[in-house]
């Protein structure tokens, strides 16, 4: 069953390019926000490890008095707002498009803008679920973990790591249970809390397939992260080479090449991440449909069995009365 779900999901990704068009911009904004968070965390970690607090405070004070401070804050706020809104919009627009493909036997293509506006019918519960589950996302947990280390210091690294490690495992279990929540909102019109409860119930009733799929998705994400890190190291290696060039003209020339390569690699990573997000969403959609269909089949079988048992009981009672 797992293999058929994965194959159907991959077929959907490769056949319908409208899904990639719909998800590219949200994935782009998501990667931008991710890089902002990573840059922030690495910078402050560097400051605390090498005791550069005075230099950092001086640099921050100078930045506050620059002409582009307001523009920088506005840009960060815009990236955050677009990331917060576009990610759930695109995700649930994709679900609507996938369901349309499935209903029409893979023959009816829908344009990206149709999927973009499909989210309107379910925006409030979808957005609520998106925010309720934010505290269980790995990025949020890692960010909070680094914050705790900065606040309490390296002396508390063992207890903090132990507690956050347990919480991370708990978050993985919770995220697995909530994997079907979006589909209950869209297809069964449930509210946010109801969808989370229904998703947990469905996941636990089908724990074997849900667990295997969730573990597979984790491996895919880890592989993507490794590839992204490898590609991100390349521009920094190039910049290190630039530092040894004595001629300013050559430095400018290679700097332009560095920027071009960095942009190309960033777009490639965004495309890779977008495709992975579509595949993951398609996989959970196929799993939801398969689990629902199997439960319906089992329920009908039990009903037929009960009817047959009742029929035999009635005939047996009639025969006994006849004798």
Language-model features: where?
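Hydrophobic alpha-helical membrane segments
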Residues: 1-323
């Amino acid at each position: 069953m797992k293999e058929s779900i994965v194959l159907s999901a991959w077929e959907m990704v490769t056949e319908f390019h409208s899904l990639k068009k719909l998800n590219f911009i949200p994935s782009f904004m998501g990667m931008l926000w991710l890089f902002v968070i990573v840059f922030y965390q690495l910078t402050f970690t560097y400051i605390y490890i090498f005791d550069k607090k005075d230099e950092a405070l001086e640099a921050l004070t100078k930045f506050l008095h620059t002409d582009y401070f307001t523009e920088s804050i506005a840009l960060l706020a815009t990236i955050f707002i677009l990331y917060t809104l576009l990610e759930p919009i695109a995700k649930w627009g994709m679900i609507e498009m996938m369901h349309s493909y499935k209903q029409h036997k893979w023959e009816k293509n829908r344009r990206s803008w149709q999927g973009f506006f499909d989210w309107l019918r379910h925006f409030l519960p979808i957005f609520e679920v998106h925010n309720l589950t934010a505290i269980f996302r790995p990025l949020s947990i890692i960010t909070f973990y680094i914050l705790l280390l900065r606040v309490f210091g390296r002396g508390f690294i063992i207890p903090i790591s132990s507690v956050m490690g347990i919480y991370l495992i708990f978050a993985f279990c919770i995220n697995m249970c909530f994997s079907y929540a979006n589909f209950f909102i869209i297809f069964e019109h449930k509210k946010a809390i109801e969808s989370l409860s229904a998703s947990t119930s469905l996941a636990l009733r089908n724990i074997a397939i849900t667990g295997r799929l969730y573990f597979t998705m984790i491996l895919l994400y880890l592989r993507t992260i490794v590839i992204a890190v490898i590609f991100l190291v390349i521009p920094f290696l190039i910049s290190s080479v630039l530092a040894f060039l004595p001629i300013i003209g050559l430095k400018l020339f290679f700097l332009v090449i560095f920027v071009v390569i960095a942009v190309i690699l960033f777009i490639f990573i965004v495309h890779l991440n977008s495709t992975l997000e579509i595949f993951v969403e398609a996989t959970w959609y196929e799993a939801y449909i398969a689990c629902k269909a199997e439960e319906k089949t089992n329920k009908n079988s039990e009903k037929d069995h009960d009817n047959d048992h009742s029929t035999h009981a009635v005939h047996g009672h009639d025969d006994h009365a006849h004798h």
